[in-house]
Amino acid sequence: MKNDFVTKLNPIKNVVFDLGGVLIAWKPDEIIASVFDDSDLQTLIKREIFQHPDWLEMDKGHLEEIDAIQRFYGRTGVPLTKLEELMQFVKESLTPIPESIELLEELAAQGFNLYCLSNMPVCRFAHIQPLHKFWHHFKGIIISGEIKMLKPDREIFEHLLSEFQLQASATVFVDDIPINVEGAKEAGLHAVLFRDADDCRRQLQSIFDSQQIVPDSEI
């Protein structure tokens, strides 16, 4: 059931969403299993690719995908064609989560200023951007690979606030990674750890209620 967020006396005006794991699907284990059948190889791929620091270097825009694939090959010995297939499947797997898009639309309809802040390489965002239609809800989008900054570092949250002239106390950040949520809080933003759309809706409403301004007539 759709929730009518109270906004008239709510000082929070801005909601910032992560992409992977929040608005779009991000399931590395399923991605790996879709390309590789062998369980030992799946473990190797997860450790040496998805959990390796090179993955964050791609997100930060310091490592191009074509160069990363060469590094993956050097660590795993998996044929380059198979690694290219894996990286293409990564892009194709980034599909919208319907319940999350519904929440995004609810917030947009009620007048919240919506923004996007995501750790993602430029090439991956360039792939998904023309495929989906929810981007118009955002007043601004920041992709880590474009600005060479990365969550949960404080500088990326400060860049967000500065770039769009947002007040931290009037802004809520939504992310599925605990350290990113903590990073946002340390930068002065309100923050929600995303589990699913319904839980996120409840957490947002709780924050809105806690920040509610009481009119003088009700004091």
Identify the meaning behind each predicted range:
Residues 2-51, 186-187:
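Active-site neighborhood of HAD-like aspartate-dependent phosphohydrolases
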Residues 45, 54-58, 104:
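Generic hydrophobic alpha-helical segments
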